[in-house]
Regions:
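Sec-dependent signal peptide recognition
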Residues: 1-7
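Sec/Tat signal peptide C-region and signal peptidase I cleavage site
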Residues: 13-18
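Accessory, solvent-exposed terminal regions and/or long lumenal/extracellular loops of proteins
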Residues: 21-31, 173-401, 405, 409-415, ...
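Short, compositionally biased low-complexity segments enriched in polar/charged residues
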Residues: 27-42, 126-136
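Surface-exposed, glycine/proline- and aromatic-rich loop segments on solvent-exposed faces
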Residues: 41-104, 162-183, 188
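Short hydrophobic-aromatic micro-motifs
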Residues: 48-50, 148-155
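A mature extracytoplasmic/lumenal domain signature
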Residues: 53-55, 68, 155-158, 198, ...
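A cross-kingdom signal targeting lumenal/periplasmic-facing segments of multi-pass membrane
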Residues: 78-146
């Protein structure tokens, strides 16, 4: 690019206002780029991107500016379906799975251990150019109407002139716009500017995602523009990267896997979203808020467990996956790996654009968390006493794991566990003098 078990899933980015360009608003419009979703299909230099668009303000005040590697032809631009991004989000979302212990009184110890091990292994039960443009050193290279969008491709001699042109076109540019635009002008990149065609948008309930297809040796996402109009704090970006080769990682920032595949207390089921937000923030803090977090890596032909059904071949083609043949991939692998990357970025911790590479690593990974419910029936058998002690030890371990994942205090966890909280260990001095 420019260069069975119950499954509960969450979408880590609750809104997806735009791609990592910036919104520019006319007059006093307050438009903020809070969170983004983007799907990237990449094979060699061939790149297709789908930029999520959940903008909900006045259509007259919408505009999107994105740096692109070259002047795009009209047939390189397409409007996608937001449902496809929703499908990717659901399919790759962090997930909570639950299992229930078997009756210890009806199983021999060897069979019991076999069943517990199998459960933990993860097998589930189921603008025209004018004088202003020329004076500012801006050239309108191309202009198109695509669906509900009017699109212009701009080139600029300097970032100040580009900012001036956009302002004189009636848009209120963020204060740091020229500074943010400058690196792309120096790289001789072009600027894709989309705004709403009110006539074509009549009756449109929601603006559709914009898709672009192009060749570029650079595999990257330009996030610096997205910081120019951030109101405060960091912004979230979810990247769904699809390649023929394997897992995608950042080459200029550390890429880490979110800690997971562990057992956590049962009460988390009531607020899995709140838990995951804390776990994600805690993981970032451990890496000084400078890491790109991997939340999912899997072959798109199957999943285990599945938070949602895998995307169909037709859906993948609509997202730009162009190398799949007509062969069916029912329950087996296909030449396509999905990587879900979550970035929380600001200018202090992410001063550069995101650079990526596709690796040959196809090892599956998912942000998976396990609830192991105890057996709650009659435990009057001889094995029942031993099993009860095992459950107490397991709950203590689950509470410790939760504290490590989230940074929550042991006391607050014990309070939320209620009667399931393991008893506090005796003071150390109890065993000294007998």
């Amino acid at each position: 690019m420019w260069k069975a078990a119950l499954l509960l899933s969450i979408l880590a980015a609750s809104r997806a206002d735009a791609f990592c360009g910036f919104f520019v608003g006319k007059a006093d419009a307050q438009l903020f780029n809070k969170a983004s979703q983007v799907a990237i299909v990449r094979d060699g230099p061939h790149t297709v991107i789908t930029m999520g668009n959940d903008y909900s303000g006045p259509l007259t005040e919408f505009a999107l500016v994105v740096p692109v590697p070259s002047v795009l032809q009209k047939d390189q631009i397409h409007l996608g379906d937001k449902k496809l991004l929703d499908r990717l989000a659901e399919y790759s979302a962090p997930r909570l799975v639950e299992y229930t212990d078997p009756d210890p009184c009806n199983l021999r110890p060897a069979r019991e251990e076999m069943a517990m091990s199998a459960a933990r292994a993860g097998t589930p039960a189921a603008a025209p150019e004018g004088k202003a443009a020329k004076a500012a050193g801006v050239t309108v290279e191309a202009s198109y109407t695509v669906g509900e969008y009017d699109i212009v491709l701009l080139s600029a001699k300097d970032s100040g002139g580009l900012e001036e042109y956009l302002r004189e076109s009636g848009y209120r540019i963020p204060r740091r716009a020229a500074e943010a635009l400058a690196p792309y002008v120096k790289q001789n990149m072009k600027f894709f500017v989309a705004r709403v065609n009110l006539k074509e948008a009549h009756g449109v309930q929601q603006l559709r995602p914009i898709q672009m297809a192009f060749d570029s040796e650079r595999f990257m996402l330009p996030i610096r523009l997205g910081m120019a109009n951030a109101d405060a704090g960091a912004q979230d970006l979810i990247v769904y990267a699809m390649t023929r080769k394997g897992r995608v990682e950042s080459t200029n920032y550390q890429t880490v896997k979110i800690p997971g595949d562990v057992e956590i207390p049962e009460f988390v089921q009531k607020d899995f979203g709140g838990f995951y937000k804390s776990a994600f923030a805690h993981a970032l803090h451990a890496h000084e808020n400078r890491a790109v977090v991997t939340e999912y890596v899997w072959n798109m032909g199957f999943c285990d467990p599945c938070a949602a059904p895998p995307l169909t071949q037709g859906e993948l083609t609509a997202l730009g996956v162009f190398w799949l043949d007509n062969a069916g991939y029912h329950g087996g692998g296909m030449p396509l790996t999905l990587t879900r990357l979550h970035v929380r970025y600001d200018s202090e911790h992410f001063p550069e654009d995101l650079l990526f590479q596709a690796t040959g690593d196809q090892q599956p990974f998912q942000a998976r968390y396990v609830l192991q419910h105890p057996f709650r029936g009659d435990l009057s058998c001889a094995e029942g006493k031993q099993y009860t002690a095992q459950v107490v030890a397991r709950r203590r371990a689950e509470a410790m794991t939760l504290a490590q994942l989230t940074g929550w205090s042991p006391a607050s966890i014990a309070e939320r566990m209620g009667p399931d909280a393991p008893p506090a260990p005796p003071p150390f001095w109890k065993g000294i003098w007998r």
